[in-house]
Structure formats: structure tokens, C-alpha cells
């Protein structure tokens, strides 16, 4: 091997070897245990960023480790290629989304190869190709035939100036991001898939996902939001009954008004002769509110003039249109109990409505609702026959009475809504439905699929080209003229089943069941926690749809889930003339630090003093991204990978420090140097365990302890950083170990082979070279080192000796020494005996293998 470690030469050579030998191409092998490792596939944005590098490095480390465990490992990669950024880039660069996307894929594919990730490139696909989305279209038509797909009108963001629908992220402060026109809410027909039919199963099966972070499961439980409650009817004078859903029927006697959503049919009726109310409803409709903002926004309402009748005590209560009642949850109407619900309390206080308390604390303490509602569960009072009942008893009794009188029923509700899959964008898979002239809607027959998205288009940045081109929509159905659906699928559709397509990417169906059931479920999935509620839930749903269609036998797609932490970097800015922040790349800033490493001054290349904003997530907007390509060019891929895995636990945030990258590079140079020095002296003999001295046994014990620890850290705990730390610690000992005798060299030889094998999943290129230098064959198909139980057995123990609680000496004794033998050696230790001079020994306590404690006075 070369004397100097030169990553560029090594990495190019090793990557060429993997390419030529198709090292990571796999097929099904029933004789081997399979392992399917998958990192969330990237959006081809143009360049890899450090977040990608971290995600894919973790996946590659797991894959290569499992491979050395003798498993048949599949690690595929592909491209989540549809989506809005491509449309925006196309408009900006005066091109079409397709060529921009395919160019980015080529560039990023090369970047992935330079990082040495062991992918089976034979399985690669991009979701924007008809070969992929054709199967999604066909599966959608099958779901339609099963009654799991329907169309209904739903509210979207509409720009009246551009006459186009906007995604939520295209609305800035209530205005269109392009022309600054106030955005309106518009009802348009959209396609939905009935995920709600699977809500209970999606909830229940979370309990089977033992390999998932508890936090993700909690987020999904809350998102699905199962609640048990009562659906009850309030009569409304001169109108239809008003249905409300409540999880707190125990508070029913405290209802003082009913709130309805602006889109509720009753609101529309009430507004017919009330222009003020009509204007208020319009205002509500055009403030589309995310659920997160509901709690903090100002509660507004207006009386409808309608009166509802309390179902049990007959009290008349007013009906209000309220901006915090959502049409798409429950029934679009709520019974308001201001004394026991904070939102209702704020509203009632604002509009001077009655506040009637009916629940008091269980512990008998005084009820105080002067400042806020009392929202705890308690004991009922002023509730007639239900007085004195606690929550569950009151729930059951009130529900039973409502049911007996035909005014209500116990029901289970879910916060989860059906999945709206229509997008009024161009760069997505066309929805395979047509409408004939008689207004009937039909799925496109399988033999006419795929419905191909034209790629050679001109983007004006306003209207989708397939909506603008009236000819594209014209087609026939059973010989009759028909119009195609011009909406495209939500891009979460493609990413909901891609993991399954990798099992049989060339299959002439959505997937090949035999291959899919060999590989699925995915054994290890790696990606960001920001996908907890959307992508991960939709994928679980899609897997159950595939199961119920007979394609897969498993219930869940991903056995284990690791959510990697974000990559942070220093961010710097200066204030411009307009008082805004101009962000400066950390690569253009010179910093001075104090003794504790804190930044005391920062100056950019222009000589400006810049402010340090702290360590924050790498992003384009803060200009604090570090280009992985530059780091690979400077230090090599192995160094970047090692830093990524060592700098922090995989699921925690990682702080990018170039000094840490330099440290990782120095470590690899040290390993290279030791292997080079060792191998240059020729072959070493085998270890003869029986012939080792005490020091040699101790060093060999350290080697095997390290193997045991690293194996556990990687396989079970997934604390890769502590595994690397253990190897570094061992390297320090090996560097200092004597090399005099043949057995010294034999132990070092065994140790270096173990070190190289343990580092291989993390730094595969350098280890490939060092493995060959150590006289070994083909590390890609080698076996993970196993520790020798015998080597871990200690012949001797180091015992601490205390006199009256203070350490006075340390002694070495045989591992099987008796208490008497230890006592004799301990009492005669020079420093110990000095402290026992002229005192009486009262008691001697021996903690085997650890401590001898002497009490004397």
C-alpha cells in the first residue's frame, strides 16, 4: 500500500471496482436471511445537501453492517421527482420541468456515487416516468371500483388575478406570492381516497411497531385523533335539526349557545336576509385557518337570529356563526359550554353570552370561573337528575337518556380526514378519470393507461399547461367523446408506495407479489421526523390497500424507523440599509473564539463585522449550507462519512464543525499509518492464546471487548458515535503497544483486521484498501468480526483498597482469589500498611473483583 493516505485515488479505484463487479446488485435468495434497508428517497433539487448526506450515510452504514452479518441486503435508491419546485425552477430558467428534473437526477446520481453509497442501481427509478406512475394510475382506478375513491367539492386557495389555484406555501400573508392579490377560498370538485375507512386499523397497528420512535407513534395517534363522544340533535325553530358532536356530554346542561361553521347550510340560510351576516361569512371563508392557528387567533362570531332548543331541558339558546368552528370536523357545529371550555369562554365573554357552570372539582375545592373556564373532569351539579355523577357515569347516563329519546347516539369520531389527492398543478401524475358528455365520470380502462403527462411544454407560471391546452383533455370513452381530468395527483401518492416498487421495479404490474413478499416489510427505514404524519401515515395506509388487493401479506411497510437529526451550522448576517438581514455564508467569515470556543468576533470577506445568529439548521434562506461536494473534494468521502457518524447520535441534531472534519481525517491517517507500518514488516503469525504474557492478554482482551461493544452499539442500540469512539480508544492503545515479539505482532494483526472490518461500514473505501494490504480477500463479502469469549476472561483483577473510606492503594490479584488471599495482599500493600500503623482493624469488607474496604480506629 502507498505510504501516504490519498483518498481521491483510493475512492475512485474502489468505486470503479464496485461498479464493474456490480457488488451491490441483489436478487431474491430464499436460502439467505434478507435485510431491506431504505433511506427516504431524495427530491432531485439539483445538488445534495448535508441533510441528504447524513440520511444516506446512516442507511449505508446499516446496510454494509448487515451485509457483513451474512444477510442478503437490498439498499435501493430513486427519485421523488414530481412537485412544485420543478415548476418554479422551470419558470425562472425558462425551460420545462422535465429536462430540469432529469439533469438534476444525473448530477445528484454522480454525487451519490462519489460518496460511496452501496446502492443497487438496477432498481433505480424516477417517479415522474410513465413506467412508474402508470401503475399508480391503474391502482387508483381499482380503488375507485372498490368504492374507496370519491369526488366532492372542497375548498382551495384561489388567486382571482392569475385565475389559478395556489398551494398553501404559495400564499404569503393571505396574498398570492406572484402578484400580491388577496387570495380567496374557492370550492372546487376534488378526488379523495377513503383513508378514514382504515382509521381504526391505522391506530391499532401503531402498537405493533416496536421499532418506531415513541414520538412518531404519538404524533400519528394525535393526527388520527380517535375520540369517543355523543352525536346529538338540537331542534332549531323553523329549520332542520342541528347535529353536534361532543366528547363532553357531561357538560350538556351548561350549554348557552351553539356555534356553527361559516360553511354550514344553516349559516347560508340565515345569511339570505342578513347582509351583515353574509359579509361576515365571506370574511370567515377567506381566512383559511390551519388547526395550529385556531388556538391563538381572535375568536369572532355573529348571531344568526336562529334559536336552538336544548335537547334535555328545553332551554332556548342562540345560534352563532363562529370563525373557530371547522366545517370538516365532526358536523360543522358545536355545543358551546363557556364555563367548561376555554374557547367557548373567550367567545362568550366577548359577546356577553351566559356562562353557566355545571361541573365542580372532585376534591371539593371551590369552583372559580371568574378568569377562565374550568376544563377538568369533575362532579356534576345544577344538572337535574345527573347531579353528583362523575365524568364516566355522567357520560353514560346522559348518552343513554339522549338515545332513549331519539335525540342522540354514542359515536366514535376521528380527527383524520379523507386524503384529498387532487392538485391543480402540472408537474404530477395525471389522475386517470374521464367525464363523458352526459356528465358521467369513468376510470380510464387499464389498456389505455398510462395517461401520459406531456413533457415538452411551455410554463407561463400561471396556468398548468395541460389545463391551458384544451386539446390535451379531449379523448373518447367507449367511442363517445370525453374530457380527461386535468388535475394531477398529490406527490405524496408516488412516495406512498415507492418502497414496494423497488422489490420488482420491472414488474408488469404495480408489483410482483412473490418478490415483494420476499423483501417486505422494509427492515430499516431512515428519514426525517417532519414526515411523521403525512408520508409515514400515507405509506402505512397504502400498504394496507396493497395487502387488501392481494399484493402483499404483511400489515405494515416499515419494521424499524430511525429519524435522523437535522444538520446545523453557524449562521452569520449583517443588517442592510433597509434594516433587513443579509445572510453571509460561514465559509466567507473569519471568526475569533475565546477559551471556551465561543465566538467573540466575526468579520466577512468584505471586512464587515457580522452578527453570529448561532448554530441553526442548514438552509438556503440562511445561506449557511455547506456543500458536501467541496468537503469530499477536500478531505475525501470517507472522512465526511466518518464525521457524520461520529459527531452526534444519529437521531440528534449534528453541529457542523470543520475542525471536527479535520479530526476525522487525522484519525483515518493514523489508522492508515499503523496498518502500513505493520504490513511493511511482512506477514504476522497467528495468535497463540496459551503463550501470551499478562500485558499481551490485557491488550487482546481490549480488542475483543471493543468488538463486543461495537457490535452491540451498531446492531442493537444504533449509537454509531459510541461505536466509533470505542474504535478510536482501541487505536490509541494499539499505537502505544510494543512490537518486539512475534506474538506482539500477531495480536496487532488480529486487532487491525478487526478495526478495519468494524470501520468498513462507515469508511468503506479506505478499509477496502487496508483489508487487501492485511492479506485479506474482498471485504465487501467478508464476515463481521466476532469476539472470543475466552479472550474476555480476565486472569487478574485490579482491586482498590480503602482505609476508612479513602483510597490508599491498588492491588492486582488472581481473578479467582479468595477473600482471605485478597485481604493478605491488601493489608501488606506498602501504602495501606503505613495507614494501618498503630490502629485497630474493626472490620474488613470485600466486594469481589472490585474493592477491599478496611475500617479501623
From Swiss-Prot:
Catalytic activity, as annotated: tRNA(Leu) + L-leucine + ATP = L-leucyl-tRNA(Leu) + AMP + diphosphate
Keyword presence, Nucleotide-binding: yes
Pfam families documented for this protein: Anticodon_1, tRNA-synt_1, tRNA-synt_1_2, tRNA-synt_1g
GO cellular component, one term: cytosol
Enzyme nomenclature, EC number: 6.1.1.4
Binding site for ATP: 620
Biological process, per Gene Ontology: leucyl-tRNA aminoacylation
Homology family: Belongs to the class-I aminoacyl-tRNA synthetase family.
Main location: cytoplasm
Chain span(s) of sequence motif 'HIGH' region: 42-52
Subcellular location: Cytoplasm
Domain of life: Bacteria
Keywords: Aminoacyl-tRNA synthetase, ATP-binding, Cytoplasm, Ligase, Nucleotide-binding, Protein biosynthesis
SUPFAM superfamilies named among the record's database cross-references: Anticodon-binding domain of a subclass of class I aminoacyl-tRNA synthetases, Nucleotidylyl transferase, ValRS/IleRS/LeuRS editing domain
Top-level class of the enzyme under EC nomenclature: ligase
Intervals of motif 'KMSKS' region: 617-621
Coiled coil: none
Protein name: Leucine--tRNA ligase
Keyword Nucleotide-binding: yes
Molecular function per GO: aminoacyl-tRNA deacylase activity; ATP binding; leucine-tRNA ligase activity
